[in-house]
């Protein structure tokens, strides 16, 4: 069927969205786009000053955004984040799980148990537990949408980032399993896998110009991505336009190889 050519505004009107790790980079861009598309957004970060700065900036743009401190690895922080959304807006329709850490660079055989625990706790376990925390609230609303932020490293691992790569591959599996289990509750679960997006989190991979150029030469689109180029995809996945999509991973990586 051909498009009518009519642009629909505010596809997320009056939806309530939680976005973790959303005061900078990809998370901030996602929070901004969801709010621009009509959602009431609750952002979070581990540091209060970062939350305050991001909330002030987004509210200055006329967007419905509030925020709270949340370390996703702490149960009490996850509970507070959910409670903030409920107290302010009465429910939760959307969760975007973006939090991740990467405290290690080197060979897999040199990774300590402590590093493995930290990466898997934050990058994988906390994602599952954050979803668990919001599902009962989504059920009360008749359904919802979860977007898990992984990485192209799930398919095409970065050298020296073994534990991080493994954690992101695990998120693709988590997405598929959550989608399978939550479909009956009308909760869709999808995954975003960004390539090398120019953010402070990925700075170690692009601050050296020679290294950046080497990466760019492997891309079909010969440049690094921008956070905003991830945000629209997430908004789409959370909207009714994606109502028949679940368990999928969308790669936003400039054409970099991205299959297992």
From Swiss-Prot:
A motif (Peroxisomal targeting signal) lies at residues 258-260. PROSITE patterns: ADH_SHORT. The gene is DHRS4. The modification N6-succinyllysine is found at residues 74, 198, 209. Homotetramer. GO terms for cellular component: mitochondrion; peroxisome. Its main location: other. It catalyses: a secondary alcohol + NADP(+) = a ketone + NADPH + H(+); 3alpha-hydroxy-5beta-pregnan-20-one + NADP(+) = 5beta-pregnan-3,20-dione + NADPH + H(+); 5beta-dihydrotestosterone + NADPH + H(+) = 5beta-androstane-3alpha,17beta-diol + NADP(+); all-trans-retinol + NADP(+) = all-trans-retinal + NADPH + H(+). The modification Phosphoserine is found at residue 202. It comes from Oryctolagus cuniculus. The keyword Hydrolase does not apply. It is found in: Peroxisome. NADP(+) binds at residues 18-42, 168. It is an enzyme of class 1 (oxidoreductase). The record marks 177 as: Important for the maintenance of the quaternary structure, the catalytic activity and cold stability. The record marks 158, 161 as: Responsible for the stereoselective reduction of 3-ketosteroids into 3alpha-hydroxysteroids and benzil into S-benzoin. This is Dehydrogenase/reductase SDR family member 4.
């Amino acid at each position: 069927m051909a498009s009518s050519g009519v642009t629909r505004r505010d596809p997320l009107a009056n939806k309530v969205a939680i976005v973790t790790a959303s005061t900078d980079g990809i998370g901030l861009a996602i929070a901004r786009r969801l709010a621009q598309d009509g959602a009431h957004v609750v952002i979070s970060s581990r540091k209060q000053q970062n939350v305050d700065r991001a909330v002030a900036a987004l509210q200055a743009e006329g967007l419905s955004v509030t925020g709270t401190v949340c370390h996703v690895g702490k149960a009490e922080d996850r509970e507070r984040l959910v409670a903030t959304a409920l107290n302010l807006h009465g429910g939760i329709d959307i969760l975007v799980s973006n939090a991740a850490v990467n405290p290690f660079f080197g060979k897999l055989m040199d990774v300590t148990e402590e590093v493995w625990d930290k990466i898997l706790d934050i990058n994988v376990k906390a994602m599952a537990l954050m979803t668990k925390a919001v599902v009962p609230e989504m059920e009360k609303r008749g359904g919802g949408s979860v977007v898990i932020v992984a990485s192209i490293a799930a398919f095409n691992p970065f050298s020296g980032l073994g534990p991080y790569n493994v954690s992101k591959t695990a998120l693709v599996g988590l997405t598929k399993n959550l989608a399978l289990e939550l479909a009956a509750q009308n909760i869709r679960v999808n995954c975003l896998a960004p390539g090398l997006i120019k953010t402070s989190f990925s700075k170690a991979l692009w601050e050296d110009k020679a290294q950046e150029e080497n990466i760019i030469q492997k891309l079909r689109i010969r440049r690094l991505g921008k956070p905003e180029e991830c945000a629209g995809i997430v908004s789409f996945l959370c909207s009714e336009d994606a109502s028949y999509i679940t368990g999928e991973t969308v790669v936003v990586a400039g054409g970099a190889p991205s299959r297992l």
